[in-house]
Amino acid sequence: MLHGSRLKTALSKVKLSAVHGPWTRVVGMHHMMKPPGGRKSIPQPLWGGAAKIKGARFTPKGEFDSVYLAWEPITALLEVQALVLMPAGSVPLRTAPWALVTVDGVVSRVLDLTDASSLKALGTNEQEMTGTWVTMKNPPTQELARAAYASGRNRCNQLWFCETSWGNEPCRIS
C-alpha cells in the first residue's frame, strides 16, 4: 500500500461511490439493552464507539467511531467471529449474545475497496485489506482508514472491502 503523501494524493483522486442497503450489523445484546458507553440515552444499535474503544479492522484504537455493516448476515457474523476467536482478539466471549440488526439507507461518498481500480490506485490489494490485522502494530487497513478519515472526503461514511465470497457474489463489509 502507498504511504504518507503518496497515499494522501491517491485518496484525493480515487472515485467515491454512493451505495444503498439493506445491510446487516452485528451488535452485542448489551448495546440493545442499555445505552452504550455509560451514556444516559436510549440504546443505540448504530453506535460506533465500541470500535473506537477497542480498535477494529479499519478503526485505530482511540481515534474515531466506526459502524461496521455487511451486505450479507454471514459476513457480519464472520467478522465478529474473527474478533472473538483470534488470539489477542479485541472482543471477549462474555459479550455474547449478539443481535443482528438490519439497516437500510443510502450512503454517499464511499471509498469502495472492492473496486480493483481503487485498490490499484492506492497500491494495495484484496489480501492486504482482508488479511489478519489483530496482531499487527500498524495494520494497513487502519493506516488507510486513518488517511481517508483525515482527508475529510468520506467522513461519516464507510470504507468498504471484500471480506469473502459466498457463491458468485462478493460479500462487502464496511
Labelled PLM ranges:
Residues 1-57, 84-174:
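Active-site and NAD+-binding cores of ADP-ribose-processing enzymes
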Residues 55-87:
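Extended catalytic/binding region for NAD+/ADP-ribose chemistry, centered on the ART fold
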